[in-house]
Amino acid sequence: MSQRWRLATGGCINRSRPLRFFFNGRVLTGYEGDTLASALIANGIRTVARSFKYHRPRGIVGVGAEEPNAIFQVGEGRKTVPGLRATQVELYEGLKAHSVNGWPSVEFDLYAINDLIGGLLPAGFYYKTFMWPRSFWKRYEHRIRQVAGLGWAPDA
């Protein structure tokens, strides 16, 4: 397996045990002992998320619990878990991870238009703008949460 961004030797991984995993629908490979973050970096994945308000590209910048950007939805269906940091998820065979705040994808995010119209979006604008009509709040709330990219609850 050729991973351009991985050191040829060293590290705390078992190079004799490759693992296949999925990130945003793409099949990638890593090794036993990798974290999701280290495997993504080794595979050359640089943009893993988008910023909350302006949807600017974000990459992995930390190595532990302090990582602010690489927060994913891991698993599917009833076993999905939102809000996991890639630096704290140990890679396993068949792992499925999804970015939570880029639409239709983190590479091409249509909500990045917010960066261009940022001057029209003061802090907290969504709390003041979407107050009426009151009956529409459920629709507004769903869309605001989707744009913020906070993940979704497991299926019942």
Spell out what each predicted region is.
Residues 1-2, 27, 34, 76-78:
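A broadly conserved detector of short glycine/acidic/proline-rich loop/turn motifs that flank catalytic sites
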Residues 12-25, 156:
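Long, low-complexity, intrinsically disordered polar/charged segments
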Residues 15, 29-31, 36-38, 80, ...:
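Residues in flexible loops and secondary-structure boundaries
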Residues 22-52, 61-71:
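N-terminal amphipathic, basic-rich helices that act as targeting or association modules
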Residues 52, 57-156:
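Fe-S ferredoxin-like electron-transfer domains
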